[in-house]
């Protein structure tokens, strides 16, 4: 298994269990799901309707995003202006790190990052933002949105802002 860790905070952000797809050469998007946690009935994959039950969330259980829950991501909030301020600083830090470690990737990163940030800004109200467990303000902010179907959530993490660790 491969764990994707933030290059600045070392927080675990995602794993290869979520089948991440590379977009614009700079961002990994991985579909995730809303799942029940808590309560005492763990019928993964069971069909409660066929068992005479119902599909409601059990008492003591809550619906959570599986990636957010598994990697203990912490929700944070931005308005457009504060997001742009954050992302400019973050991109500058990633670019500096790339120039040390992989300078030939810098032009690809700059072009792709600019394209993806425009996409985020264009639909800003639809995005949710999360920090890693350490809540490091200089680290990556994981972005969450929904696919065109409106029901499938996905997270987006910056390819050049992570290190892959095999476990």
UniProtKB/Swiss-Prot annotation:
The record's annotation in Pfam families points to: TCTP
Single biological process term from Gene Ontology: negative regulation of autophagy
Q: Read off the InterPro entries from this record.
A: Mss4-like_sf, Mss4/transl-control_tumour, TCTP, Translation_control_tumour_CS, Translational_control_tumour_p
- GO terms of molecular function: calcium ion binding
Instruction: Kindly give any further remark recorded in the entry.
Output: Present with 27800 molecules/cell in log phase SD medium.
Q: What does the record give as the function of this protein?
A: Involved in protein synthesis. Involved in microtubule stabilization.
UniProt subunit comment:
Interacts with the 40S and 60S ribosomal subunits. Interacts with microtubules.
Family that this chain belongs to: Belongs to the TCTP family.
Q: What is this protein called?
A: Translationally-controlled tumor protein homolog
* Upper taxonomic lineage: Eukaryota, Fungi, Dikarya, Ascomycota, Saccharomycotina
């Amino acid at each position: 298994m491969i764990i994707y860790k933030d290059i600045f905070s070392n927080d675990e952000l995602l794993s290869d269990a979520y089948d991440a797809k590379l977009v614009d050469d700079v961002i990994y998007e991985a579909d995730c799901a809303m799942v029940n946690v808590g309560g005492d009935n763990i019928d993964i994959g069971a069909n409660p309707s066929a068992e005479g039950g119902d599909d409601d969330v059990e008492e003591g259980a809550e619906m959570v995003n599986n990636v957010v829950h598994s990697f203990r991501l912490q929700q944070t909030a931005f308005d457009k202006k504060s997001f742009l301020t954050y992302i400019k600083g973050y991109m500058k830090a990633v670019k500096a790190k790339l120039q040390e470690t992989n300078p030939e990737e810098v032009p690809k990163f700059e072009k792709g990052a600019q394209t993806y940030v425009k996409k985020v800004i264009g639909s800003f109200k639809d995005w949710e933002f999360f920090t890693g467990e350490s809540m490091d303000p200089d680290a990556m902010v994981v972005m969450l949105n929904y696919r065109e179907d409106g029901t499938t959530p996905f997270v987006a993490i910056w390819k050049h802002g992570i290190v892959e660790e095999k476990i």
